[in-house]
């Protein structure tokens, strides 16, 4: 398998784009040179073709943003119809109302505001919590985007002032005592607890409910970051899956099958403070993404897409939810070998297996066959270097 055109484009990109791409997870820090495609040409269903013409079964699914499959006909039809009417206007469009109503029906939220990226939504939820409680500190668990408030407590915090870093504190998943210690150290100072409902491991019985109870007992809001789990774990997201309701929830990724849209949703009493804080985007009401979201969410609900993903992913390797499996590597050499050999065998997977509705049992069998064969090979490219840990 040759990557000549990909590497030529990478050389060009590095002259005008820092790291050669707009998204860290798609950069050369995550793809071994000489053994990887760097640029896509097109995609259809669960298939992706790179600029060299190589075909892959794509288990990355646009970093979980593709839930129905690339070029889904229902989403495409909705977007084409809206394109004839317009993309953005000088007034709001009724799609803002229709998609908000749909999200409320599916998730149990009472009010909704839109952003574009997951980071928009999580930052908005945190600002809203601070405004509502009058407090400054945040307890977090998981990955919540690139904004200063959360990235400052990771190893990639260059440019984040210490004063901002000092307001965010991490606790460990499935360790309620680690959260108790945070509240004990700073009583009456926390505005919110924000967390992913799960990523690599399942919550222990009652853990999410314990977190919510502890947050409320200390006067803090309970925020679930469902940017990835939303509409993937169940029609109503992880809240439905685990039988819990948060004060605020953030959504993104799968909500519009790849079109840029994110959401802050929650209880009306809290959400109405959005009228007082500043959370505003020129393109938050952009209509192609809203049309895509309306079609995507209706299809997810109508065809129970999460159930299909759950059943399809039952036998996949790794840890976590069957629709979002996390592969565990002994080190960077093992991960690089995995990428090298899976690419050679026409599998695109960057370390998590992100299923979409276009994947089939045949695709899962192909993944297993490629994985078994990859274990017999040797590394022929330079191993990737460690990067900052986000989960």
Describe the predicted segments one by one.
Residues 1-391:
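Conserved N-terminal phosphate-binding loop of PLP-dependent enzymes in the Aspartate aminotransferase
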